[in-house]
Amino acid sequence: MARIAGIDIPREKRVEVALTYIYGVGLTRAKSILAKAGVNPDIRVKDLDDGDVQKLRTAVESFTLEGDLRRQEGMALKRLQDIGCLRGRRHRMSLPVRGQRTRTNARTRRGSRKTVAGRKK
């Protein structure tokens, strides 16, 4: 396995797909990394030589990925919560943030239903 950005990427997959195992790298970014490094996207990871792997490492270093990206996203959410804006409050209450309805639906975000005892007649 080639190790890029602290992640062991799978040997049997095409390089283009294998790069998406890195947090913060999707298919589009993987294609741009391969173009920047000058590596053919159709070859398998096991067929890469050391020079190609080194080129990929240097190309990947120019992006914010993995732990740094997770930390950056967490700090952005914490900032929203600290300033007390609506988005931050919705995140804190585990409710949908982008204006979706919550009277019905939003079950994934709100969690499982809380059982309410039925009234006796």
Curated annotation (Swiss-Prot):
Pfam families assigned to the protein according to its UniProt record, in alphabetical order: Ribosomal_S13
Gene3D superfamilies: 1.10.8.50, 30s ribosomal protein s13, domain 2
Keywords: Ribonucleoprotein, Ribosomal protein, RNA-binding, rRNA-binding, tRNA-binding
Comp. bias intervals (Basic residues): 100-121
Entry-linked InterPro entries: Rbsml_uS13_C (IPR027437), Ribosomal_uS13 (IPR001892), Ribosomal_uS13-like_H2TH (IPR010979), Ribosomal_uS13_bac-type (IPR019980), Ribosomal_uS13_CS (IPR018269)
One Gene Ontology molecular-function label: tRNA binding
Oxidoreductase keyword on record: no
Cellular component terms per the entry's GO annotation: cytosol; small ribosomal subunit
Function, in words: Located at the top of the head of the 30S subunit, it contacts several helices of the 16S rRNA. In the 70S ribosome it contacts the 23S rRNA (bridge B1a) and protein L5 of the 50S subunit (bridge B1b), connecting the 2 subunits; these bridges are implicated in subunit movement. Contacts the tRNAs in the A and P-sites.
Family: Belongs to the universal ribosomal protein uS13 family.
NCBIfam families per the UniProt record, alphabetical: uS13_bact
Assembly and oligomerization: Part of the 30S ribosomal subunit. Forms a loose heterodimer with protein S19. Forms two bridges to the 50S subunit in the 70S ribosome.
Protein name listed in UniProt: Small ribosomal subunit protein uS13
